[in-house]
Amino acid sequence: MAGHSKWANIQHRKKAQDNKRGKVFTKAIREITVAAKLGGPDISSNSRLRLAISKANSSNVPKDTVERAIKKALGDKDQNIQEITYEGYGPNGIAVIMECLTNNKNRTVSELRHVLSKHGGSLGTKGSVLHLFKKVGIIKVLDTTEDELLSHMENIDLIDFEIIKDGCILFTDPNKLFEIKKYFEEKSIMVENEEITMDPITLINIDNMQQEKILNLSDKLEEIDDVQNIYMNVNLG
């Protein structure tokens, strides 16, 4: 259904961001802590925590580390972490969204502005690029052909899908992510991955030299401790 491979582009971005393994653990723990603090420790009623734990498991974060993060969230009443989304521009005018968790907003803004300006970009105002993306849920189901997927279409509500070598990638409303995951699990169809992401409405094509600059910017933004996720409307696939 997809005109271009959104999954390939997402995987390229994730691979670049996941190269720093220690940072992946830190991010996973921080997201679990914030999710538990905001919504409580019960995953049946806290979908954000359920998703955070699922992502931590995918990154091989030890179970006891996950449990400690939840306990810390419940016991540390003084930890004042804010969840803030910043918007900006990179080289060639590409749009950049930076999702952050921070206990010092001024520090975070300063670090983001410094990295963006050093790499030919700038920090934008609220709403400057957010409209160029849409929030979507993504589910990867294994060992499922297109015909098999089509047989389930009456029972699930999808925005889009892609057929890949080892299964299917499903794009859905974020609010229906766990409902669809549960549907497939009840059918004994293995779900390997689920997440919520910001999907660019239109991708900008770039050459190899431009891609190197943009990946370098992404790496430097990832090195900022407060940054959780980075999204760009550029074709990296």
Stretch-by-stretch model annotation:
Residues M1-G124, V129-I138:
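N-terminal cationic and glycine-rich segments that engage phosphates or anionic surfaces
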Residues I138-G237:
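Positively charged, low-complexity, intrinsically disordered RNA-binding extensions
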